[in-house]
């Protein structure tokens, strides 16, 4: 009986999340008042997607510079981010937009190859000067910087030298890079994020090969010249965990006492809903969570990989030694969650997918889908992978609370895209009611997770302030609450969603009707106001 009770206590959180339905919350209005005092609202970006100026300021090349030039066919419109939205030159204007929206914070990333053009060696003073200027400009407007150290753009020099994240050498180099940033900027930056979406880096860069550095072995290297999809993702993830822990402890030893900052990591996390009520699909949904969020959260919380991963991946999963356990477990002050959508999950009984692909993505023995019985889980956004499922963010928050002990969480990315096409005129693009509804309903569910379920969620970052270059999608989709006119000097024009955020962050409740927020004629007149003026 005693052992049975222990089993019940272990399984209880799992039972609560997957078996007890949460109310699906939808609200016609939402405001800052629906969140606790001190809750942070901000927007998010990354260096490669926003900065441009890839050949200015003595910046070195990154793996994404190389990837877009050597493999342009892997970008939907064959584009690159050489210019993108040119925030490198326009950040003062963009900060004014954030201030106008009443945002509290801005999450951006530092380009490693701007600080160290060769990955290591001499610090580039031009890079330090640029980020000092950006940080100072944010603080001058009362906006807190949340700084990501790595958002996918490894210096190409390190990829050439020792194959980047596949080598244990990268741990020391990342620690040195992090130390340099803490020393240069930590007197003003109090929230650091070591890595953005390490799961995405591992799978998309080293399993499917659709993102930099483009390594895979699918169908006998049909898609990639180099790589091993069943092994390399696990090595990369392991080295990223060690690098994160090294940066965390470097901060604790050298900077924490004086700077009083916090160190986190941003993990991409879908919610997985069982396809049916049968036990095998419920187990599959839990495995999907293990192979996604749990791949990194379990080591940080418990000091080891999830049991399901150790069982299914076996010897291909690197071992966390007792020494690593001491370093990795508890190596965070908060967790960032990047959440966009929810999928159905069912058990892969036949394992044919695994037999054919021989890759890490099929190790979990889970098949996911946005459809059940021919019905979509939610309305589709611009991209086929993104369906709008607001209740998923609440279930995810409760899962993190119940499974991982309710750590401090920031939603470091949430947003939706719409198609960018020459056949969509500006007037239609500015009237983005769907985006307003998306954020209203996701925020309503997040508020319920905080107020009703007692989840320790402390902030919400919109992806994104501006339309921008979106990795494999290039410029074919728009995530911004500001429209970027790519044909007219990269002019920033507020969409209805921008004015909606301005209203709710000013303390007022707001409807989702864009006609009550901003007239499209007014938005057109405001183009001149937001045009770039050289400083």
Curated annotation (Swiss-Prot):
Binding of a beta-D-glucoside, residues: 49, 151, 196-197, 340, 413, 463, 470-471, 479
Cysteine-cysteine disulfides: 216-224
GO terms (BP aspect): carbohydrate metabolic process
The protein's Enzyme Commission number: 3.2.1.21
Glycan attachment sites: 118, 445, 489
Matching Gene3D superfamilies: Glycosidases (3.20.20.80)
Protein name in the entry: Putative beta-glucosidase 41
SUPFAM superfamilies the record matches: (Trans)glycosidases (SSF51445)
Keywords: Disulfide bond, Glycoprotein, Glycosidase, Hydrolase, Signal
Family: Belongs to the glycosyl hydrolase 1 family.
Catalytic residues of the enzyme: 197, 413
GO MF, one annotated term: beta-glucosidase activity
Database matches in InterPro entries: Glyco_hydro_1 (IPR001360), Glyco_hydro_1_N_CS (IPR033132), Glycoside_hydrolase_SF (IPR017853)
Signal peptide interval: 1-27
A Pfam family: Glyco_hydro_1
Catalytic activity: Hydrolysis of terminal, non-reducing beta-D-glucosyl residues with release of beta-D-glucose
Gene that specifies this protein: BGLU41
